[in-house]
């Protein structure tokens, strides 16, 4: 198993944006010092839920101060961007970093964000599909020729090409069974999270669907990776870990519930009906439920090691994206968590 750090760049009250951004960048820069394999900033807009509107800008800064850590996105929301610009930006980042890019992509889900950009959320799937194909062609074709519903290009030379050949690994965020199947059909790596209304057993079942689809479409499952976003915190003791991590986690869920779907009383968005029921669930969820379902793994180091080992054995996850820097948790607590992960947890799980 490999280990990464997910960064939402959330902005709860009480800290300036400058403080929050500086702290999260410092943690990302120190990731390789503490033995982590990757860092993954997440794109979000227009609320305290997340203020990293441009992961590529964030990662360009990290690329110049690190040597080994992989530079992932968790994720870039493709319907908000012109695909040629995405291809150019991440090809340049791949060149600047010497081939360390891991491009995570998704179609987005927050109505506030779609409205802010004037994008029709009901068309997110078709925008995502076209954008993804264009990005891959930009990276692999000498000249870009493409005729789609939303994008058309004729004999376009897109440069630079990525450092990695044929291109950086691409990861697709998946929630529904259909999206797991799509990732398998396309031969993409997979990003998933039991945070979003599921369980570890449910995740294992969907990963099985993904791997079966890979094989049935001519892709070798052993060459594709599965990354899991898990809220993980290693404390000095079981009780202290809960005391330190419960408040940030509950802040996250209450904030997530504000933006995941249309407001109560408003109609569900076509193609996103499930998110309305998710909104109601996350607004009512309590800490003990999160721990029981495996959404949160929090405790002293032996407990965290055991639970992560169960996750690995049950699901076959290759890459843990530790979701710890959330809800305004302090920089000092984050450093302590990273030190314990390095010393007591990661060595036995690699």
What residue ranges belong to the model's regions?
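Conserved, mostly hydrophobic/aromatic
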Residues: 3, 31, 35, 43, ...
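Active-site mouth loops of central-metabolism enzymes
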Residues: 7-22, 76-84, 164-174, 233-235, ...
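Hydrophobic faces of well-ordered beta-strands that scaffold small-molecule active sites
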Residues: 3-7, 39-41, 71-73, 101-105, ...
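N-terminal beta1-alpha1-beta2 module of alpha/beta enzyme domains
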Residues: 1-65, 69-71, 165-168
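An alpha-helical appendage that flanks or caps ligand/catalytic pockets
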Residues: 125-158, 200-317, 350
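Flexible, glycine-rich active-site loops centered on histidine and acidic residues
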Residues: 2-19, 79-146, 150, 189-192, ...
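Alpha-helix-loop-beta-strand connector modules within alpha/beta enzyme cores
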Residues: 52-73, 127-130, 339-350
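Glycine-rich, proline-tolerant flexible connector loops at the mouths of alpha/beta enzymes
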Residues: 38-62, 77, 194-199, 323-334
């Amino acid at each position: 198993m490999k280990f990464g750090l997910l960064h939402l760049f959330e902005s709860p009250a009480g800290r300036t944006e400058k403080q929050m951004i500086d702290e999260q960048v410092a943690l990302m820069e120190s990731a390789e010092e503490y033995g982590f394999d990757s860092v993954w900033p997440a794109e979000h807009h227009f609320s305290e839920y997340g203020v990293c509107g441009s992961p590529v800008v964030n990662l360009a800064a990290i690329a110049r101060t690190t040597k080994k850590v992989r530079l992932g996105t968790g994720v870039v929301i493709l319907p908000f961007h012109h695909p040629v610009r995405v291809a150019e930006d991440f090809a340049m980042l791949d060149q600047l970093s010497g081939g360390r890019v891991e491009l995570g992509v998704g179609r987005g889900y927050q109505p506030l964000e779609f409205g802010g950009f004037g994008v029709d959320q009901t068309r997110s799937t078709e925008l995502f599909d076209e954008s993804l194909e264009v990005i891959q062609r930009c990276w692999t074709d000498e000249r870009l020729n493409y005729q789609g519903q939303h994008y058309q290009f004729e004999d376009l030379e897109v440069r630079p090409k990525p450092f990695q050949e044929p291109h950086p690994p691409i990861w697709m965020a998946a929630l529904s069974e259909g999206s797991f199947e799509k990732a398998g059909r396309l031969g993409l790596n997979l990003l998933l999270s039991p945070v979003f209304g599921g369980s570890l057993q449910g995740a294992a079942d969907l990963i099985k669907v993904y791997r079966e689809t890979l094989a049935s479409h001519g892709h070798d499952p052993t060459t594709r990776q599965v990354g899991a976003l898990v809220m993980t915190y290693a404390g000095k003791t079981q009780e202290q870990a809960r005391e330190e991590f419960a408040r940030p986690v509950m802040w996250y869920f209450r904030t997530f519930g504000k933006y995941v779907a249309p407001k109560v009383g408003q109609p569900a968005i076509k193609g996103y009906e499930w998110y309305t029921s998710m909104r109601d669930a996350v607004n009512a969820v309590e800490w003990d439920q999160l721990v029981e379902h495996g959404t949160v793994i929090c405790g002293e180091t032996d407990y965290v090691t055991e639970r992560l080992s169960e996750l690995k054995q049950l699901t076959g996850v290759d890459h843990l994206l530790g979701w710890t820097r959330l809800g305004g948790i302090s920089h000092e607590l984050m450093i302590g968590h990273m030190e314990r992960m390095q010393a007591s947890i990661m060595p036995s799980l690699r």
